[in-house]
């Protein structure tokens, strides 16, 4: 994938607009997870070291084009300064004369954060005038928000049409990891795709089948495939209306030479609550009044054996209802084994999606995978094979501006 990075960029004295993703989880005004801030810090530090005047901007939450004080980026700018170890200014606007004055007063190496771009309706509408108003405060645009790349908004796509545009280091790392996962992977390559519904991951499964050698279907989604094969899944969550689709997917996988691996046993319970009585049974022997809530030990063993044969693993979705013990066991055991193989240099592991990242953190191995994407929606749309506007414009804008 051809896009320009910060390598060799002369940023000294230049106003560099950095589109970060500062949309961090907050509770009662306190940031509960600063991962996204930690991830964007290397790009900002590099630009500061190069003598740039760094102007950071981002969306936060969904204010729907209105000014909502509780959704201000002010507390996030403060936290970013603590992470970077230097003062970070804050401007209570993202366009207009106040911003122009603040940017005009910056010295080389200074950093400011602008107010939430979504306080303006022009952001989500990708209004060209709003994009121009953002762009006029920069000489260079650096997009370091892969997690917002699936949205064609003014701050992700519009600005890139008006300024020389580059991928930041986090964007570069995400794109390199994703390319290694599915575009040019070391084979054999496998994917763990979990979640509750086939209907929400149809495009994803269809795209992945074309690219992987082994597809592990896990979580409640597997129940639909099992039921479509005539297995009794008791009272388990499943989509009866998707049985024919599941059979078509299985047939397509066979045509493409992709092996689908389904659970062979399960941990079941009568209630979906913490620490309720459970039993383990083979698939096909699930009691009528029970629900499948986790993969069983034989399934874990089967997946571990298959992981031994792979060079690359893409992971999206847990193996069971991992949020509640003891239904986290299969997810934790497979995650820890994948991490062990990664540490031994035998497997490249690329994981993403909100539940997946939470599950890997729960298993204590989020930092031991080759790459864990914080992107959520953008990661899923990339897995679906969709064009991401924020990436596409980085490729085309350089050409438009004669900067290839």
UniProtKB/Swiss-Prot annotation:
Its main location: cytoplasm. One of its GO terms (cellular component) is cytosol. PROSITE patterns: PGLYCERATE_KINASE (PS00111). Its EC number is 2.7.2.3. It catalyses: (2R)-3-phosphoglycerate + ATP = (2R)-3-phospho-glyceroyl phosphate + ADP. Substrate binds at residues 21-23, 36, 59-62, 118, 151. Belongs to the phosphoglycerate kinase family. This is Phosphoglycerate kinase. The gene is pgk.
